[in-house]
Amino acid sequence: MSIKIELFGITFENPLILASGVVDMTPELLRRAHKEGAGGVVTKSIGIEPRKGYDNPTVVEVPCGLINAMGLPNPGWKAFLEEFEKESFDFPVIVSIFGGNPEEFAFLAEKLERVGDAFELNLSCPHAKGYGLEIGQDPENVYRVVKAVKDVTDKPVIAKLTPNTSDITKLGLAAEKAEADGVSAINTLKAIAIDIYAKRPILSNKFGGYSGPGIKPIALRAVYDLASKLDIPIIGIGGITTWQDAVEFLLAGASAVQIGTAVYLKGFSVFREIAEGIRKYLEEEGFSSVKEIIGLAQKV
């Protein structure tokens, strides 16, 4: 049975997408993710200027996941474009971009128009001052950023939403009003880990983003809420490590899912395992496509 999906007019071999920020953004590693079963990939977030990121330690493993504060390390748009515009991929590549204001997002979308199949707007990084979270918590800012990007590109635009808010649906509705093609949710939760013997925060940045199985129920609720209010597709993110997790997100209303921390902890093979589990589930439950189960839990 095929578990292909159509999203934003793009064909994905399956509904599993490599999340941004998990692996280095070399073309070779993105191809490896696809070879191991990812239906598509999202690059690391690209900004206007190169960023070194934070000093180590930048990642700490905690019960039920990870806390990371990488600091949005990236080579800048010029170096990224130089490396990627000469590459061709036989699978969907979504380019993640970040900026400090709508003009910066629009600038990057214009400059990177020749690369990838869609843009994901990182409106929700919880640990990089002046970017992401500080922009993405305000529905008006979400609207302005999405609209600025939509004004300069014909490619699909996906707004990545923060869970660090009282009502994520307001952010989703703002993105939809600005004609976003879809939203992805959730990004990481702002968190901290403390070394009880050193008596100080473990990460060099003190705070980071919490990801992994521990945030799955929160992410699932966010997707469920968004699906009840929005008419545009939702990509579910947050703690997906098994095929059962992925199916839950699809039933909640996600059209596809992104997988990140599970790749860090278990390797790329997690994509094939989850894809096979989804395929068997559909067969056993009498469905002929992924599309048939999207949002079924909304109809109770």
From Swiss-Prot:
Cellular localisation: Cytoplasm
Binding site for substrate: 44, 68-72, 122, 187-188
Cofactor(s) annotated in UniProt: FMN
Reaction catalysed by this enzyme: (S)-dihydroorotate + NAD(+) = orotate + NADH + H(+)
Entry superkingdom: Archaea
EC number: 1.3.1.14
NCBIfam families (UniProt xref): PRK07259.1, pyrD_sub1_fam
Family: Belongs to the dihydroorotate dehydrogenase family. Type 1 subfamily.
Record PANTHER family: DIHYDROPYRIMIDINE DEHYDROGENASE [NADP(+)]
Protein name: Dihydroorotate dehydrogenase B (NAD(+)), catalytic subunit
Source organism: Pyrococcus furiosus (strain ATCC 43587 / DSM 3638 / JCM 8422 / Vc1)
The gene coding this protein: pyrD
